[in-house]
């Protein structure tokens, strides 16, 4: 489950980033461009595979990229639950424009102390798209906003994956919403009935030597013993076998542990998956 969730998260993140980078037209570059120390973090699961290609088409304007990243982040974030959006510090509105403004305000405030007039070296901007791009004309503040928006997109992708999965083992087993809760309750009741039946017949068999003495009332005996025998093919043999091997203790313990795990997992709150460069992420 973990590997699958990680893959799905990366696919969502790649889609948002690639659409943002590809939505901006190419811009001209200077005659000489220094690429020493460039930060190109090619993600996994790129389709087509990631590539580092230098040319006139490998450039993108920083302001266009920032706007596109914020739009992509807003589009994905608007589909998250109110709880997830609140956890990210994003407006809980379902209106994409309001969510986009909220994301812009977050990154703007995070990078508030940086200059808006000096153009930074391209090495200050991290490229996370599958295809390499040279980000042109970025001020210190815009570069900071681009990096922080990309990190925010990573968190949005993690929450989107967790939300789709149900957010916990409970969601994976039973699905989300009311239907999942009802299914869990039904399964727990069935397990409880099985445990009760096993415990009852074990206690009764320990008090009596033969199956015919399990209960003295003939009608009740016929109902309980006969019905149980038809269900498992011989209650006394089944119970005797369990008692001799102590297997019933293991079965009861295993079922109880399963119930406890399921109940605990229903209280799990989806947490964003940790990513590299957590120090640059928005909290």
Curated annotation (Swiss-Prot):
- Which GO terms of the cellular component aspect does the record hold? membrane
Listed A to Z, the keywords are: Glycoprotein, Lipoprotein, Membrane, Myristate, Transmembrane, Transmembrane helix
Topology with respect to the bilayer: Multi-pass membrane protein
| TM ranges | 181-201, 250-270
Per the UniProt annotation, where are the glycans attached?
31, 95, 105, 108, 137, 147, 277
Localization per record: Membrane
User: Where does lipidation (N-myristoyl glycine) occur on this chain?
Assistant: 2
User: What is this protein's name?
Assistant: Uncharacterized protein L323
Organism (species):
Acanthamoeba polyphaga mimivirus
């Amino acid at each position: 489950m973990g590997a699958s969730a990680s893959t799905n998260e990366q696919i969502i993140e790649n889609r948002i980033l690639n659409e943002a980078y590809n939505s901006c037209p190419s811009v001209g570059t200077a005659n000489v461009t220094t690429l020493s120390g460039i930060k190109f973090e090619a993600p996994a699961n790129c389709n087509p595979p990631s590539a580092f290609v230098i040319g006139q088409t490998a450039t993108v304007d920083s302001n266009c990229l920032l706007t596109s990243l914020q739009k992509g982040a807003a589009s994905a974030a608007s589909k998250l639950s109110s709880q997830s959006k609140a956890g990210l510090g994003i407006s809980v509105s379902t209106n994409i424009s309001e969510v986009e403004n909220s994301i812009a305000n977050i990154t703007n405030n995070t990078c508030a102390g940086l200059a808006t007039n000096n153009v930074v070296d391209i090495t200050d901007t991290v490229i996370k798209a599958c295809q390499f791009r040279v980000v042109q004309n970025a001020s210190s503040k815009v570069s900071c906003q681009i990096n922080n928006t990309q990190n925010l997109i990573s968190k949005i992708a993690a929450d989107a994956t967790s939300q789709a999965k149900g957010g916990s083992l409970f969601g994976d087993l039973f699905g989300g919403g009311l239907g999942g809760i009802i299914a869990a309750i039904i399964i727990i009741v069935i397990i409880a009935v099985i445990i009760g039946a096993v415990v009852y017949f074990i206690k009764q068999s320990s008090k009596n030597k033969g199956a015919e003495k399990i209960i003295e009332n003939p009608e009740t005996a016929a109902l309980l013993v006969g019905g149980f025998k038809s269900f498992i093919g011989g209650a006394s043999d089944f119970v005797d076998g369990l008692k001799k091997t102590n297997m019933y203790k293991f079965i009861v313990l295993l079922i109880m542990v399963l119930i406890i795990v399921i109940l605990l997992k229903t209280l799990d709150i989806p947490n964003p998956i940790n990513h590299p460069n957590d120090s640059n992420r928005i909290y």
